[in-house]
Amino acid sequence: MSLKIKDIKVKGYERVIHAINEITKLDCIIAIHNTKLGPSLGGVRSWEYNSFEDQKKDVLKLSEAMTLKNSICGINFGGGKAALNLKNAKKTPELYQSYGEVVEFLKGE
């Protein structure tokens, strides 16, 4: 399997992972900010990031915002978000299939 997943420690976040698939060109960071109200809920931003740090900064900001949005709405979900870097990839079914494998790896976190 060409999918590689690495945990990244970030203060104030429950879990942050970086996933790479060399075959599909997946370069994805998933950030789970807070699950005190329930499992994380958020979406996917597909963007051409100039650097890993830009991608990480964006996904951290977005996942924290999802925690706040879900709390304000009074729903029982925490905040999470994914950022896919499209700088070296095209939006293909294979790319998003490999992203789905990363989500499956988290088993509902």
For each of these PLM feature ranges, what is it?
Residues 1-109:
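N-terminal ligand-binding/catalytic initiation module
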